[in-house]
């Protein structure tokens, strides 16, 4: 019989209804994951490039792309938009996962969430979150 060993492992969940730059994309545990990633040390980045004349180390520099280089210039184009909506009333969010808006504001509805709530995206702010279904009028 094989001997069982206990090793630490990390399970990561993603909520793809939120864009990657939104904290809820990584779930409520995003801060815990960030702390774990900061403690993680990957020795491969400290090794020198083999076959290189100079002894520069590989670094993990982040690369940012200009929005103009992107195939889509419309932020909501990466989402599956079910319908456009117009806010009938002002809504002040009570929780971090809710999206606030003002009367007349246009939103993109991404999906239904739970009874009476929709998941919406606001092109103007680039944010997404839950909105009360009775506060918006869907444009079909």
Swiss-Prot record:
The UniProt entry, under Pfam families, shows:
SH3_1
Is Phosphoprotein tagged as a keyword?
yes
BP terms from Gene Ontology: intracellular signal transduction
Modified how = Phosphorylated in vivo. In vitro, phosphorylated by shk1.
What name appears for this protein in its UniProt entry? Answer: Shk1 kinase-binding protein 5
Q: Which GO terms describe its cellular component?
A: endoplasmic reticulum
Q: Which gene encodes it?
A: skb5
Q: Which InterPro entries match?
A: SH3-like_dom_sf, SH3_domain
| Function text | Stimulates catalytic function of the p21-activated kinase homolog shk1.
Any one Gene Ontology MF annotation carried by this entry is: protein kinase activator activity
């Amino acid at each position: 019989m094989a001997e069982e060993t206990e090793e630490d492992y990390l399970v990561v969940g993603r909520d793809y209804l939120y864009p990657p730059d939104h904290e809820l994309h990584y779930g409520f545990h995003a801060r815990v994951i960030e702390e774990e990633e900061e403690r993680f040390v990957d020795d491969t980045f400290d090794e020198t490039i083999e076959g290189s004349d100079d002894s520069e180390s590989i670094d993990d520099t982040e690369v940012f792309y200009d929005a103009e280089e992107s195939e889509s210039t419309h932020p909501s184009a990466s989402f599956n938009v079910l319908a456009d909506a117009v806010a009938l009333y002002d809504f002040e969010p009570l929780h971090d996962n809710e999206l606030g808006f003002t009367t007349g504001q246009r939103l993109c509805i991404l999906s239904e969430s739970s009874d009476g709530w929709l998941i919406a995206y606001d092109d103007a702010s680039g944010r997404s979150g839950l909105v009360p279904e009775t506060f918006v009028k869907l444009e079909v």
